[in-house]
Structures are given as C-alpha cells and as structure tokens.
C-alpha cells in the first residue's frame, strides 16, 4: 500500500507493507545518499537498526547511531549528542537521517535532520503502532523542556515513511496499548465510522495478527489525513489531534516514564469527555464509549495513585496550546467534543477555555473514581501494563 500524505503544500509517500524490509533497503539505496545515518534507541538498534546497516553497508555508507530509550531522554541534549556523532562520522548536506523507532526517536531524529546544515533529508521507519498510525503523519518535530512536553521544536517534512507491520510483532504489550489509545482517539474525535471496527477488533491481551494491524493503521491514516490536509502546522482543524493531550501530557510528564504516551492520552480523553459532559456538551453514552474502547484496548481508565495530582495540575500551566485562546488566568485550553467526531469550536479553532477548577475536580474523581469503570459484558483476562505476553522488544512510543 502506498498513499500520498498531504499536509498543506507538503506531499510525501507513506509505504506500508508486511515483511518488506528488502523493499525498504532498496528505497534507501535509491536515495543516492552520501551517507545514511540510522538513528535508533537502545531497543530498536539491536532489533532493527543493526540488520539495516548490515544490508545497506555493502552498497552505501551507513552508520548506526543509538540513543538511550525513553521519553525522559527526549531533549535538546540528545539531539546535540547525536548530531555531533553524525558530523564526526562524516555527515554532509547529501546525507540522509533515517529514524528507526517510535515517537521519541522520530522526534529526536526529525529535529536533528532539520538542524544539521539547516536541513538534510529525513526518512521515517516507524517501529511502533503509535508511530505508524500517528506521529509520522505529522510535520511536528519536538523535544521536551524541563517544564513540559514538546515545547521546543519545528515543523519538518520527511522524504518518505517506510513502514513494515512485521516490526510490530516484537512490540511489548505496553507499547501496543499505547498506540491503540491514539487510534481510539482518532475514532472518537475524527472518524466515528471506525468505532464498530474497533469494538470487534480490539483485544485486552493486545495480540493482533498482521491483517488487523494493517487495517487499524490504514483507518488511522485516513482519519488523521482528513484534518491535516489543509492544516500542515496543525494549528486549526488539525488541533483536534490534541484531543486528550492537555491533561494527558501533564499526566505523562508527571509520571516520568511510568506511563506510556498513549496510555496517558487515554486518561486525558476520559477527563476531557467527563469535562465536556459536565459543561452540557457530551452525552453520557459518548462518555461511556470512551471507557469502553479504552478498556477493550487493554488500557486503564483510572489515574494510578502513584501520579501526583497536584503536579498534574501544575503542569497544565505549561501546555503547548497556551496562547491560542485569550484564556482567563485560571483556565486551560482543551479540545472537547460535542458528539462523536464533533469537536467544539471557538475563534476558528477546536478549542474551549475550561476553568482549571473543573479540570481539577474531574482529575481527582478519575484518580479516585466514584464513576464506575467500564466492564465488558464478556470479560477476558486483562494484561497489566508493562507485561510482555510473548516477545520482548520495543519501540519507544
């Protein structure tokens, strides 16, 4: 499958297949790069990066650059360290940065490509579900600041995305669920026609065959493309992709690696749905659907007690959507839904100014829920986050 990703005036191909590493190698060789800089983390390097370099090296200069895995290490220091290594290896303007990993490596390598020589070519080889179905469908390349997530970065387009669903077979439970939470987001906020497919396909054990993964990724591509085609900087219609991210980012940052990105966003969606319901916009059936789909995906819908709720509320003040609305001092700009696939708009953007007191009230209740969690009619065994059912491997989400 090949689709053209359209983000405003930007176009690039997304090639999706299964067991297609040979084709990926041919695509990379065809770029006639002076050097291929294969950027991985400490998980994806041994799993995929080493084999890529081995296959490429007889035909084109290729080097493996490995960074420590994990969201806590997504910062400017990582970008600088990897860029210095690339330059010492002989990188020049004709080199290509190849990001092999999940969302973290994609952002680090993407920002590195944008900065080296003021911009060299970039290719994404996503190895996680969250990357294949979400992060590579964007021009955003960003790293974290000391006060919050994704506060330093730029917009930079890849030459192409080359994806092999076979790479998802090594994905741990935690990272599969992480990606599925973003897929659920796309269905609830953008493409409700996906809901019945997800109800049928989602599994609490997070074990999927290649065909199901292919369908899930394909549907997510269509969902995301529909709101970014005329909004390459994701500052108007594309802001709907931030659904669940206001509180979700704050939870993720506070958890300091204890929760995956997608799991935190899932919790952020539960908060956003309940906030919208209390403001009189979203009906209870739609709120319950949030919990149902997340539960079916194997995600938690209660904020863990280890997460410091006061710190979560503090981190909301550093959300990367600040400034889009003329927010009162004690409020937060959030993407809220008035119905499935129906974000609420204000001043030309799908954002609503919400009192911080209401957000805090809902956050506290979801951490110590009086609202019952959704229970499947025919429950199956739930695998705890972090447990790897069969295979060990990873991408970084």
Swiss-Prot record:
Cofactor: record remark: Binds 1 Co(2+) ion per subunit.
Molecular functions (GO terms): 3-dehydroquinate synthase activity; metal ion binding
Temperature profile: Optimum temperature is 42 degrees Celsius.
Reported cofactor(s): NAD(+); Co(2+)
Pfam families attached to this UniProt entry: DHQ_synthase, DHQS_C
Annotated NAD(+) binding sites: 41, 71-74, 103-107, 127-128, 138-140, 149-150
Class of enzymatic activity (EC top level): lyase
Keyword Ubl conjugation annotated: no
EC number: 4.2.3.124
Catalytic center residues: 140, 242
Reactions that this protein is recorded to catalyse: D-glucose 6-phosphate = 2-deoxy-L-scyllo-inosose + phosphate
Pathway noted in the entry: Metabolic intermediate biosynthesis; 2-deoxystreptamine biosynthesis; 2-deoxystreptamine from D-glucose 6-phosphate: step 1/4; Antibiotic biosynthesis; gentamicin biosynthesis
Entry keywords, A to Z: Antibiotic biosynthesis, Cobalt, Lyase, Metal-binding, NAD
Binding-site list for Co(2+): 182, 245, 261
GO biological process: antibiotic biosynthetic process; aromatic amino acid family biosynthetic process
InterPro entries: Dehydroquinate_synthase (IPR050071), DHQ_synth_fam (IPR030963), DHQS/DOIS_N (IPR030960), DHQS_C (IPR056179)
Family designation: Belongs to the sugar phosphate cyclases superfamily. DOI synthase family.
Role summary: Catalyzes the intramolecular carbocycle formation from D-glucose-6-phosphate to 2-deoxy-scyllo-inosose (DOI).
Name of this chain's protein: 2-deoxy-scyllo-inosose synthase
Organism per entry: Micromonospora echinospora (Micromonospora purpurea)
Organismal lineage: Bacteria, Bacillati, Actinomycetota, Actinomycetes, Micromonosporales
């Amino acid at each position: 499958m090949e689709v053209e990703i359209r983000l405003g005036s930007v176009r690039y191909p997304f090639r999706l297949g299964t067991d297609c590493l040979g084709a990926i190698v041919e695509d990379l060789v065809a770029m006639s790069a002076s050097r291929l800089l294969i950027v991985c983390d400490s998980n994806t390097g041994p799993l995929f990066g080493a084999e890529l370099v081995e296959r490429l090296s007889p035909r084109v200069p290729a080097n493996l650059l490995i960074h420590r895995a994990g969201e806590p290490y997504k910062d400017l220091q990582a970008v600088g360290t990897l860029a210095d290594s690339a330059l010492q290896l002989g990188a020049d303007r004709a080199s290509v940065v190849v990001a092999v990993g999940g969302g973290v490596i994609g952002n680090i390598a993407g920002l590195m490509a944008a900065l080296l020589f003021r911009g060299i070519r970039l290719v994404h080889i996503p190895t996680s579900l969250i990357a294949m179905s979400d992060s590579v469908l964007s021009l955003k390349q960003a790293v974290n600041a000391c006060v919050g997530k994704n506060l330093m970065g730029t917009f930079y387009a890849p030459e192409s995305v080359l994806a092999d669903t076979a790479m998802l077979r090594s994905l741990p439970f935690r990272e599969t669920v992480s990606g599925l939470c973003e897929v659920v987001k796309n269905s609830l906020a953008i493409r409700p026609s996906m809901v019945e497919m997800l109800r049928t396909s989602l599994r609490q054990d997070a074990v999927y065959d290649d065909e199901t993964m292919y369908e899930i990724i394909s549907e997510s591509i269509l969902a995301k493309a529909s709101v970014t085609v005329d909004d390459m900087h994701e500052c108007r219609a594309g802001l709907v992709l931030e659904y669940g991210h206001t509180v979700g980012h704050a939870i993720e940052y506070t958890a300091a690696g204890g929760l995956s990105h997608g799991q935190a966003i899932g919790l952020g969606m539960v908060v956003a749905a309940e906030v919208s319901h209390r403001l009189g916009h979203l009906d209870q059936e739609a709120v319950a659907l949030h919990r149902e789909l997340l539960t079916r995906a194997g995600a938690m819908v209660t904020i863990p007690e280890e997460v410091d709720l006061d710190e979560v509320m503090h981190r909301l003040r550093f959300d990367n959507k600040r400034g889009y609305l003329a927010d009162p001092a004690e409020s937060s700009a959030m993407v809220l839904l008035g119905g499935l696939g129906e974000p609420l708009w204000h001043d030309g953007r799908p954002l609503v100014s919400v009192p911080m007191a209401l957000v805090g009230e809902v956050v506290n209740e979801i951490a110590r829920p009086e609202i019952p969690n959704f229970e499947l009619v025919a429950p199956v065994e739930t695998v705890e986050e972090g447990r790897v059912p069969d295979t060990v491997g990873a991408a970084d989400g």
